[in-house]
From Swiss-Prot:
Topology versus the membrane: Peripheral membrane protein
One GO CC term, this protein: plasma membrane
The encoding gene: plsB
Catalysis performed (reactions): sn-glycerol 3-phosphate + an acyl-CoA = a 1-acyl-sn-glycero-3-phosphate + CoA
GO BP annotations, alphabetical order: CDP-diacylglycerol biosynthetic process; fatty acid metabolic process
UniProt KW keywords: Acyltransferase, Cell inner membrane, Cell membrane, Lipid biosynthesis, Lipid metabolism, Membrane, Phospholipid biosynthesis, Phospholipid metabolism, Transferase
Annotated GO MF terms: glycerol-3-phosphate O-acyltransferase activity
Name of this protein: Glycerol-3-phosphate acyltransferase
Lineage, top ranks: Bacteria, Pseudomonadati, Pseudomonadota, Gammaproteobacteria, Pasteurellales
InterPro entries on file: GPAT/DHAPAT, GPAT/DHAPAT_C, GPAT/DHAPAT_LPLAT, GPAT_PlsB, Plipid/glycerol_acylTrfase
Source organism of this protein record: Actinobacillus pleuropneumoniae serotype 7 (strain AP76)
Amino acid sequence: MSSLLNFYRKVLNVPLSLLVKSRAIPTDPVKELNLNLEQPIIYVLPYTSQTDLLILQKNCLALNLPDPLQNNELNGQSLPRYVFLDEGRRFFKSKGAKSETESIFYRYLDLHRNNESLDVQLIPASVLWGRSPGKESEPHLRLMSSFQRIISMIWFGRDNFVRFSQALSLKYMVAEHGADEGIAQKLARVAKIHFAKQRYSAMGPRLPDRQAMFNKIIQSPAIKAAIEEEAKTKKISIEKARQEAEKIVNEIAADVSHESLRIADRVLSWLWNKLYQGINVQNGDRVRKLALEGHEIVYVPCHRSHMDYLLLSYLLYHQGLVPPHIAAGINLNFFPAGPIFRSWGAFFIRRTFKGNRLYSTIFREYLAELFYRGYSVEYFIEGGRSRTGRLLEPKTGMMSMTLQALQRGLTRPISIVPVYIGYEHVLEVDTYAKELRGAEKEKENAGLVLRVIKKLKNLGQCYVNFAEPIQVNNYLNQHFPEWKESQAEDSRPKWLNEAVDSVAHQVMININKAAAINAKNLIGSVLLASRQRALAREQLIEQVDSYLQLFKNVSYSDDVIVPNDSAEEMLNHVLTLPRSGVISEKDSFGEMIRLDRESAVLMTYYRNNIQHLFVLPSLVASIILHHESVSKDLIIKTVNRIYPFLKAELFLHFEENDVRNQVEAILTEFSAQRIVKYESDVLQINRARVRALQLHAAGVREILQRYYISLSILLEHPEISRAALEKESRSIAQRLSILHGINAPEFFDKALFSTFSASLKAQGYFDSEGNCILEKAKEAEEILRSLISVEVQLTIQGAMEKVEEVENTETVVKTAEAVTEKNE
């Protein structure tokens, strides 16, 4: 039988090699699953299939894993390196009987009784053919004929995945539970349950009958009440209001097609190969683990580009997970993109629906229905794409609906997965720069898509990092234990608003904790730190290397992606990128690297992607640079005073009582790099490396200038309203940016001044009547003034005087006009 089986496998390998292109998940199981190749491995497949076994063998050999068709030789015994859990339908009965599998498990367990050094690793491995879960109306079990199986191999041969799961230590099993036959049976049962969960995590719930789902949503009590109110308010019939509700549901709802997803996979594979030199994915195992544990997963990525929608779904598909239902702006619902996106899982949301109770109720019920049915969901918490490269303040509407769905009694736990997405080139960055200069946002349409497609070429690297998940049930139990208390159907729980804001803010913090440093954003940051946007090649490489050492030795967080390339390799890479704006020039003194003028503004976008990583070291460097000689205690005191503003603006994760340790680590690293002299708790400039200190300090320069502008105005006008403070601060910042050549468009972004004024209020700079507390503001202003050049101070003071002159003139004119009107 063995020779006949081997012959059958050889024959079967011929069509498999031609028709099947398989992908492994994870792509590097030895590293990601922490496998020990010095110890034996046994592969467990869910059911008997020689086809699956041969595909597993091919993947194992490609990944440098032991060949499953070779036996393990242990203590004089020759044991198979694979087992099948269920018999299934098969031609040969040499493997796969359930009793035989349990017998093999028992023999492996028994070997551990007298061999303490042995630790056999049991690896569940399943082969997926296609990813469609089927429709709700279809039967659960469908037997395929031989012809159908051949067709399936042809059709799904390029949609084949081998999923390796976390290895189970048999040494641990024996130590904890013993090695009798009962344990072998239990092992088989547990493996069976694992495969069922794994299949569900890869395929998801069955697709609904769309019309039946619509009818269920429309019949919900909340929507019935909203329909009645709509009819009453607009003085129309109930039937007409119901038709409007059906129209809204149809406008919102996705219409997922797995055949469309398979086609998208082919198209996007071609697109990414054309666009990017590589897509770097980190921490996908976190999401796979949550899916296996049965969590309802909500993906919340930062929003850099329209590419984000496509990229994340594509990567999740290739991580062996179900692509989520994606909340997309209604602006993307144009022909032909709208129907295509809808078939890929997009459901559409209007930009605003304030005051439209019918729409808001339907949307909330639709989202709750997705959660109820077990579909993963994705939405962009920033509301729109960031035009500056920084995270925007979160829009909390979708988060509120998510927490309300949980509070309504969702049985599965919800886990929110923040996702950092970063690019070495964002397709829309030119458009963003125009919009920041005041141009109107161009409406999305087919023509715009075609113009973007023309730009498709080498765009460098792309990064996707799955940040630390937030298990919402646990988070609410810890911070808002009252969430479990029952509430009336129509009432809004008191805890909800605060909880929504808290979770949303934590999402932003976790996204920034998972930032990716790449060649473009790091080299761009260093060049922008130089006032002339140019450095000698040697100086640039030295500074980039200084940052790399800093990021590795004083980690912002364990999730940050730090390049393994050298500074030299990173520079060479950026110089090869088209439209990077980084130019190499030579003169009699050597090679210069500079940013061209037009690209400087665009480069601030990429700098802002990672500014939060170096803002604290920059602040420390700035304090030392301006004081020349300063005690460690004064540095920490100064940082503690400014840090709350930085934390609010840049979503920093350090709590205020952790800042001291981080500052001390930064000082130690600066000293190790000989950037400063550090003796007896006193820091001094090292003249030999003062240029490096200046470049480090420049990373926070513009932020401190903005803070100084607002505090200067506050001291001059203590009773000024917050709205007027933000407006006047922005006007002065615009003038300062022109006079001092500040290229960053966000320097006078009204949102940043709004965030700062909110931070001032939160930190107690205003009294109960909204007036400035002068003593506290004066202390902060003096600290900031010590870190800002005299030239900038004079410009700000001059601008304030100009503003006052204009205001006085306007007052005189208005008074004169009033007198004239009175006389007339």
